[in-house]
C-alpha cells in the first residue's frame, strides 16, 4: 500500500517543514482525535490528514490502484484565505507525482502516483478548520515477498 513512502516524502519536505508540517502535523489516517495545537502560532496554522481509500483490484494482476486523499486543514481563527491551503497542495502535487519505483520501509514500493482532483472549499466543524483535499491514485507493489 506504500504508506511509508508517502509519509516519508511529505515529512522530509523542507518546503512543508517551513510551513509548519513537522512531527505531529501530518496525521496518518485520522490518527488524532483532536487537532494539533495550530492556533497558538500564526506561522503554523496547518495540519494534514492522510486518508487511504479503497483499492480496486484487477483480477489479471491481483493488485490495482489505491486512492489517497490528503486533507489540508487550516485554523479558521487565523485565516479564511483558502489560497493558503491551495499553496500547500501545490507543494504536495510534485512531491507525490515525482515518486517513481521507490521502496518504502513497510515493504511496499510505489510504482507511480497520479493526481485525480481536488475538493471544493470546505469547513470542518469538528476540527474547527477550513480545509480542502487533493486525491491521488497510487500503484504499488509488495517488495518483501518478491510478489509483483
Regions found by a protein language model. Name each.
Residues 94-148:
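Acidic-leaning, charged glycine-interspersed low-complexity segments
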Residues 47-48, 68, 113, 134:
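A broad, low-specificity signal marking well-ordered, structured residues that form hydrophobic/aromatic
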Residues 62-79, 129-141:
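Oligomerization/assembly interface segments of phage tail-like spikes and tubes
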Residues 75-97:
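Extracellular/virion structural assembly segments
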Residues 1-61, 99-106, 147-148:
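Small/polar-rich, solvent-exposed N-terminal microdomains that initiate assembly or binding
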Residues 65-67, 87, 148:
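Short intrinsically disordered coil segments
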Amino acid at each position: 500500500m506504500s504508506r511509508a513512502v508517502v509519509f516519508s516524502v511529505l515529512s522530509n519536505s523542507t518546503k512543508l517543514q517551513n510551513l509548519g508540517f513537522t512531527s505531529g502535523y501530518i496525521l496518518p489516517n485520522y490518527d488524532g482525535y483532536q487537532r494539533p495545537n495550530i492556533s497558538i502560532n500564526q506561522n503554523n496554522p496547518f495540519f494534514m490528514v492522510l486518508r487511504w481509500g479503497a483499492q480496486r483490484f484487477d483480477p489479471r494482476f491481483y493488485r490495482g490502484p489505491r486512492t489517497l486523499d490528503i486533507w489540508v486543514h487550516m485554523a479558521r481563527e487565523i485565516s479564511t484565505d483558502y489560497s493558503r491551503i491551495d499553496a500547500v497542495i501545490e507543494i504536495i502535487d510534485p512531491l507525490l507525482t515525482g515518486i517513481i519505483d521507490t521502496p518504502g520501509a513497510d515493504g511496499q514500493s510505489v510504482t507511480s502516483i497520479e493526481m485525480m482532483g481536488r475538493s471544493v472549499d470546505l469547513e470542518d466543524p469538528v476540527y474547527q478548520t477550513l480545509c480542502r483535499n487533493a486525491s491521488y491514485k497510487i500503484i504499488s507493489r509488495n517488495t518483501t515477498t518478491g510478489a509483483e
